[in-house]
Curated annotation (Swiss-Prot):
Keywords, ordered alphabetically: NAD, Oxidoreductase, Tricarboxylic acid cycle
Pfam families tied to this protein: Ldh_1_C (PF02866), Ldh_1_N (PF00056)
Protein's recorded name: Malate dehydrogenase
Top-level taxon of origin: Bacteria
Gene: mdh
Cellular compartments per GO CC: cytoplasm
Source organism of the structure: Salmonella gallinarum (strain 287/91 / NCTC 13346)
Its EC number(s): 1.1.1.37
Listed PANTHER family: MALATE AND LACTATE DEHYDROGENASE, MALATE DEHYDROGENASE, MITOCHONDRIAL
Record: residues binding NAD(+): 7-13, 34, 94, 117-119, 227
Its biological purpose: Catalyzes the reversible oxidation of malate to oxaloacetate.
Gene Ontology MF terms: L-malate dehydrogenase (NAD+) activity
Length: 312
């Protein structure tokens, strides 16, 4: 099993690479790519960790050597948020980066499962899909927007509020991956209930958690370590499913049947070919249903922006 991390010299990429070096199954290969010249050195640094995961680093304009034979590609390349920016402000820079890298994936490892971490995810996933489609290699079961950070934040905040162990809480989060499009299904957590006010406040905190980190870092960065952990969790789940483990379920942002929007985050059963089944989002509370209806315009607009970037 070979996993490639693109954008591996950045804050998320280095954290993700460290976690994968420690947690990938024995015998796996990990390849790191970034435009930054430090990348081969990051791989050398990580190579001193005594796990049976082979690691190599590549830098420069060409990601091809890192992508050859990859089963899973995780893309965290791009610029990070600064105070006062929201994820959509990143679009102008990151759209071109994702387009370029996905074009290289289409040529080099078109059958790989691709997880997009680069924000704005609502839009960059649509860009990736259109690039793969143009190249004639698009498989909607193999392209994911990694929204796992919304899930782990929800788990943490719910556990804090309700005095639970964070490891016993699993909150499904649907919709997209920015602002109002992030919708935690708090009504679906077994054995936990919320007042309407608690649900509204907690939903808002989860939606704005990224901004909380950006402001706390006072201009020194965005959520890199928690995002690295979230991306590692998703990547490792994908690897387990590709290797034949049954019953692996994660929420991610994928193309579905278009019931709500072309791309939508929902619980997925993962399998040997990527998405095995898009699971139902279940019954929503009145607050959740209202939030879902209210976000769809924003989500569809974000998606359209990505489609137009490639097709216009």
């Amino acid at each position: 099993m070979k996993v490639a991390v693109l954008g591996a010299a950045g804050g998320i990429g280095q954290a993700l690479a460290l976690l994968l070096k420690n947690q990938l199954p024995s015998g796996s290969e990990l390849s790191l790519y970034d435009i930054a010249p430090v990348t081969p050195g990051v791989a050398v640094d990580l190579s001193h960790i005594p796990t049976a995961v082979k690691i190599k680093g590549f830098s420069g304009e060409d990601a091809t050597p890192a992508l050859e034979g990859a089963d899973v590609v995780l893309i965290s390349a791009g610029v990070a948020r600064k105070p006062g920016m929201d994820r959509s402000d990143l679009f102008n820079v990151n759209a071109g980066i994702v387009k370029n890298l996905v074009q290289q994936i289409a040529k080099t490892c078109p059958k790989a499962c691709v997880g997009i971490i680069t924000n704005p995810v609502n839009t960059t996933v649509a860009i990736a899909a259109e690039v793969l489609k143009k190249a004639g290699v698009y498989d909607k079961n193999k392209l994911f927007g990694v929204t796992t950070l919304d899930i782990i934040r929800s788990n943490t905040f719910v556990a804090e509020l309700k005095g639970k162990l964070p490891t016993e809480v699993e909150v499904p989060v649907i919709g997209g991956h920015s602002g109002v499009t992030i919708l935690p299904l708090l009504s679906q957590i077994p054995g936990v209930s919320f007042t309407e006010q608690e649900a509204a406040e907690l939903t808002k905190r989860i939606q704005n958690a990224g901004t909380e980190v950006v402001e706390a870092k006072a201009g020194g960065g965005s959520a890199t370590l928690s995002m690295g952990q979230a991306a590692a969790r998703f990547g490792l789940s994908l690897v387990r499913a590709l290797q034949g483990e049954k019953g692996v379920v994660e929420c991610a942002y994928v193309e579905g049947d278009g019931q709500y929007a072309r791309f939508f985050s929902q619980p997925l059963l993962l399998g040997k070919n990527g998405v095995e089944e898009r699971k139902s989002i279940g019954t929503l509370s009145a607050f959740e249903q209202h939030s879902l209806d209210a976000m769809l315009y924003t989500l569809k607009k974000d998606i359209q922006l990505g489609e137009d970037f490639i097709n216009k």
